[in-house]
Amino acid sequence: MTQPQPAPREPKSRLLHDGRDMFWSIGPLVLACVVLAGVLGMCSFAPAGPGEGRVPNFDAPAALRADADALRIPVRVPALPEGWRANSGGREGIDGGRTDPATGQAVRAVATRVGYLAPNGMYLSLTQSNADEDALVGSINPDAYPTGSQDVAGRSWVVYEGGEDAEPVWTTRLDGAGGPAQIAITGAGGTDEYRTLAQATQSQRPLTVP
């Protein structure tokens, strides 16, 4: 006798096919949204601007000693009060920046620069160089011009201004056993910060270059 055949399965609903297709269509989009939400969750909105970040650790005394040895110019390590922090530094050249006393010709000058943060967070940079005054100031702000002077513990610093939004440049020439050095200070600090950095620098003897 012929065995009864099982009834054929009913075809899957088209809705199931559509649902599977929809899953594979929107799955990557959902995953992308989850990733984006995670990234945004690690961010924060600061309407007043970025907060205080970590100050880079820069060993100014070691860097200045290395610069004095490499550049062969008088370099001083400022004796700054507590709360001041060095955060950057480097060397640079100034083409035609000094006058050779033997020939009277303009030759290349060199400079070392260290950036400091005052206790109030304001940034100032200290540049020490064998350049002539006008060349050193011009390397910092080509539009600067002298507007007066400031007396710091009996030493005169020439003050240069360079426009409404430009930061002032204070400069003086310090003599020492290793020869003269032109010093320049500029930055976002006020007069008190300029004077503190100026006094901390001029009060020190230049490093001995072997």
Language model features with spans:
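A generic signature of intrinsically disordered, low-complexity regions enriched in glycine/proline
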Residues: 22-25, 104, 147, 179
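Short, solvent-exposed recognition patches
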Residues: 57-163
